[in-house]
Design a protein with these regions (language model features):
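Cell-envelope/ECM-targeting effectors and their regulatory/trafficking segments
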Residues: 1-261
């Protein structure tokens, strides 16, 4: 049990327990989907939008950016900061207080989360996109048991380069559905296809043939190198150059899946 998570749960029930669309949160000090959804419901109540525990585009637009510039003498704004602090605690980041004040400890941990998500330039502000990444149960730190450092580097690079075209993906060093869709979205953006994370016939038709001396862009080759690494085929470099290492890795993949090189 985490005492800070318990404090967050108690605050949520005390603050929103009388709202008809707010189911009581179990006060057990354990972070889980029910607590995360309760935090989202609280934000939706404050923003005056449909209360369903789902952070869709409408909710995110209504909530806006949570930052030190919010006037926390206004209770709605203060509650937004409370909820953001609660989200950080549930995510494993200690903002040095659960008080509804966006102080230096909060700024420090938001910056840390931004860095973990892959951003080099950090602001300390919680944008709607960052808020959606905080208010879920996915890990943005390297998984100590299953995480791979190179996979995490790829996840962070995808967030850094393509966050305008997708939600932030977890940076836990584990290749899964979020990273897979991130790779597809990145490719779709680079080839001028509709960005939806689905590798369908349209994406296939626009996808270039990548070969040594070919015309594929550096960005597309880099995405190929990312994908090879994620499938445990080593291209030697993540540099966007289709050299001997990338060519060898592609041939190894072709052999693995039974394709004739």
């Amino acid at each position: 049990m985490d005492l800070k998570v318990l404090e967050v749960q108690k605050w949520l029930n005390l603050t929103y327990g009388n709202h008809p669309d707010f189911p009581a949160v179990t006060e057990d000090g354990l972070t889980g989907n029910s607590t995360i959804k309760a935090l989202i419901r609280g934000l939706q109540i404050e923003a005056g939008v449909k209360v369903d525990g789902v952070l869709g585009s409408g909710s995110l637009a209504a909530i806006g950016t949570i930052s030190p510039s919010l006037d926390t003498s206004v209770q709605t704004n203060r509650n937004k900061v409370y909820i953001a602090q609660g989200g950080l605690y549930c995510k494993g980041y200690n903002p040095k207080g659960f008080d509804g004040i966006y102080g230096s400890g909060m700024i420090e941990k938001v910056r840390e989360f931004e860095t973990d998500a892959g951003f080099i330039s950090t602001t300390g502000n919680i944008t709607p996109k960052l808020l959606k990444a905080i208010l879920n149960t996915e890990n943005f730190r390297l998984d100590e048991e299953k995480g791979d450092h190179q996979i995490r580097t790829i996840q962070q690079a995808l967030n850094r380069s393509y966050s305008n075209y997708m939600d932030l993906i977890p940076c836990n060093g584990i290749y899964g559905k979020f990273t897979n869709k991130g790779l597809i979205r990145a490719l779709q953006h680079e080839i001028g296809e509709t960005v939806d994370g689905v590798f369908g016939s349209g994406t296939m038709s626009k996808c270039p043939t990548i070969k040594r001396g070919g015309a594929a862009s550096k960005s597309v080759v880099l995405i190929l190198q990312y994908a090879l690494c994620c499938n445990k085929f080593n291209p030697n470099q993540l540099d966007g150059v289709f050299g001997a290492g990338a060519e060898r890795a592609v041939k190894e993949f072709q052999e693995f899946v039974g394709l004739i090189a």
